[in-house]
Amino acid sequence: MDTLTRFLPEHLQQNQLPEALGGVLLSVVSACTEINAKVRLGALAGVLGMAGTGNIQGEDQKKLDVIANNIMIDTLKANPAVAGLASEEEDSFVSAGENGRYLVLFDPLDGSSNIDVNISVGTIFSILEKPEGALATESFLQTGRQQLAAGYVLYGPQTQLVFTFGHGVYMFTLNAENEFVLTKEKPKVPESTKEFAINMSNRRHWLPPVQQYIDELLAGETGTRGKNYNMRWVASMVAEIHRILMRGGVFMYPQDKRDPSKPGKLRLMYEANPMALILEQAGASASNARQDILGIRPESLHQRVAVIMGSSEEVDYLNRLHSK
């Protein structure tokens, strides 16, 4: 089986991609391998619990949020091809190599609310080309379609790397020698599914199309949809999307009525966009109920967005309910 270090040069060459772009991916992987070691040790390394600080989102930070963020920043800044970074845990962008060609956006530890109870978490990343001119916030405000690469690392029972350069999705598993080994090529998400993932406790806040949709799913084979559905909810986007990539399903974090200034909970630039690219490359769909995630023109670095992702039949159906 191919290791990442053997696979990557050939993949880059076949698809006429720059070697430096592959080098940025390897820097991300190096950082994630270090993060994985911290996650695995947990309480033994004294890294669980709260950090006593908050991020730009107004969220309390866990110790591992801060540790993972610092590892990502330090590792990526050491790569001269990286011009700048943007993180969920940083108020603004971070400058890196003066002559760098690439921008990296990331959520260093997605699902960190689960870390103290030993449920899967992960790192999500997106790679963009730096536009001409001085580095500024506007340099990062590109649509998801402009991503050069996207991926995530899932820290679960197995540690797995999933990424795409826009030429299919590839999945690698970390072995005992700390090498990522290719274990799945070009997975395809089934168009239809019987699984959905949503936080049902928010039902009273949802907009009517989402309430109708979930009611139809819960009605099962005697209802409009004519089949029984199972619900899943991990509260870790990486874990939810990985399950969909492996066996299908639909994941939703929809807009609700609580705060009109926040059209969703998840962040467009370093959560929704990379996951949308991965799923689209695997034959699935991703929208905010009004348009494709990858076509949204970002207005700010930490912009939030409603998310509906997964098996295309379900995403399309929920989009149609919103258009009525």
Curated annotation (Swiss-Prot):
Catalytic class of the enzyme: hydrolase
Superkingdom of origin organism: Bacteria
Cofactor(s) listed: Mg(2+)
Keywords in alphabetical order: Carbohydrate metabolism, Cytoplasm, Hydrolase, Magnesium, Metal-binding
Pathway(s) of this molecule: Carbohydrate biosynthesis; gluconeogenesis
Cofactor, free-text remark: Binds 2 magnesium ions per subunit.
InterPro entries: FBPase_C_dom (IPR044015), FBPase_class-1 (IPR000146), FBPase_N (IPR033391), FBPtase (IPR028343)
Reactions catalysed according to its record: beta-D-fructose 1,6-bisphosphate + H2O = beta-D-fructose 6-phosphate + phosphate
GO molecular function: fructose 1,6-bisphosphate 1-phosphatase activity; magnesium ion binding
Binding residues annotated for Mg(2+) 2, in chain numbering: 107, 110, 271
Listed Pfam families: FBPase (PF00316), FBPase_C (PF18913)
GO CC terms, sorted: cytosol
Binding site for substrate: 110-113, 199, 265
GO biological process: fructose 1,6-bisphosphate metabolic process; fructose 6-phosphate metabolic process; fructose metabolic process; gluconeogenesis; sucrose biosynthetic process
Binding site for Mg(2+) 1: 88, 107, 109
Annotated compartments: Cytoplasm
CDD domains recorded: FBPase (cd00354)
Enzyme Commission number(s) from the entry: 3.1.3.11
UniProt keyword RNA-binding, yes or no: no
Family, as annotated: Belongs to the FBPase class 1 family.
NCBIfam families noted in UniProt: PRK09293.1-3, PRK09293.1-4
PANTHER family named among the record's database cross-references: FRUCTOSE-1,6-BISPHOSPHATASE-RELATED, SEDOHEPTULOSE-1,7-BISPHOSPHATASE, CHLOROPLASTIC
Subunit annotation: Homotetramer.
Record's protein name: Fructose-1,6-bisphosphatase class 1
